[in-house]
């Protein structure tokens, strides 16, 4: 039994190593996806820019980039998020 388990492990590892890497069928989009949102607003003065996550992500999100280059996910439906976006667009 131990021999067959070891043989199975070797076969699985060899298969994983030999499998061709699949490229993205659409593009080399490196935009991150968000799986959780920040619970409360960030200080507006800490935010320098923003971007939206890709439409390929399961959760729509706005990613705020702070002055220290931290990326923070926010819910685009929240009022404070929309206000921050408007403020960034005006500046």
UniProtKB/Swiss-Prot annotation:
SMART domains: SCY
Gene3D superfamilies hit by this protein: 2.40.50.40
Residues with Methionine sulfoxide modification: 90
Site (Cleavage): 25-26
Result after altering residue 49 to A: No effect on inhibition of activity by tick evasin-4
Keyword annotations from UniProtKB, A to Z: Chemotaxis, Cytokine, Disulfide bond, Glycoprotein, Inflammatory response, Oxidation, Secreted, Signal
Keyword Secreted applies: yes
Disulfide bonds: 33-57, 34-73
Inducing or repressing factors: By mitogens.
Record localization: Secreted
Pfam families for this protein: IL8
Tissue expression profile of the protein: Expressed in the follicular fluid (at protein level). T-cell and macrophage specific.
GO MF terms held by the record: CCR chemokine receptor binding; CCR1 chemokine receptor binding; CCR4 chemokine receptor binding; CCR5 chemokine receptor binding; chemoattractant activity; chemokine activity; chemokine receptor antagonist activity; chemokine receptor binding
Protein modification: N-terminal processed form RANTES(3-68) is produced by proteolytic cleavage, probably by DPP4, after secretion from peripheral blood leukocytes and cultured sarcoma cells. N-terminal processed form RANTES(4-68) is produced by proteolytic cleavage by cathepsin CTSG.
Family matches, as InterPro entries: Chemokine_b/g/d (IPR039809), Chemokine_CC_CS (IPR000827), Chemokine_IL8-like_dom (IPR001811), Interleukin_8-like_sf (IPR036048)
GO biological process, one term: positive regulation of cell adhesion
Signal peptide feature range: 1-23
Origin superkingdom: Eukaryota
Documented effect of changing residue 24 to F: Antagonist of the chemokine receptors CCR1 and CCR3
Outcome following mutation: residue 31 to A: No effect on inhibition of activity by tick evasin-4
Residues of this chain annotated as glycosylated in UniProt: 27-28
Broad class of where this protein is predominantly found: secreted
Main function: Chemoattractant for blood monocytes, memory T-helper cells and eosinophils. Causes the release of histamine from basophils and activates eosinophils. May activate several chemokine receptors including CCR1, CCR3, CCR4 and CCR5. One of the major HIV-suppressive factors produced by CD8+ T-cells. Recombinant RANTES protein induces a dose-dependent inhibition of different strains of HIV-1, HIV-2, and simian immunodeficiency virus (SIV). The processed form RANTES(3-68) acts as a natural chemotaxis inhibitor and is a more potent inhibitor of HIV-1-infection.
Family, per entry: Belongs to the intercrine beta (chemokine CC) family.
Complex formation: Homo and heterooligomers with other chemokines. Interacts with the brown dog tick evasin-4.
Protein name: C-C motif chemokine 5
Species the sequence originates in: Homo sapiens (Human)
Classification of source organism: Eukaryota, Metazoa, Chordata, Craniata, Vertebrata
């Amino acid at each position: 039994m131990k021999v067959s388990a070891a043989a199975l492990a070797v076969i699985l590892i060899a298969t994983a190593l030999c499998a061709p890497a699949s490229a993205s069928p659409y593009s080399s989009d490196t935009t991150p996806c968000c799986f959780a949102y920040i619970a409360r607003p960030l200080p507006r003065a800490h935010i320098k820019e923003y971007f939206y996550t890709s439409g390929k992500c399961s959760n729509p999100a706005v990613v705020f980039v702070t002055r220290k280059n931290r990326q923070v996910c926010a819910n685009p439906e929240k009022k404070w998020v929309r206000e921050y976006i408007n403020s960034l667009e005006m500046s």
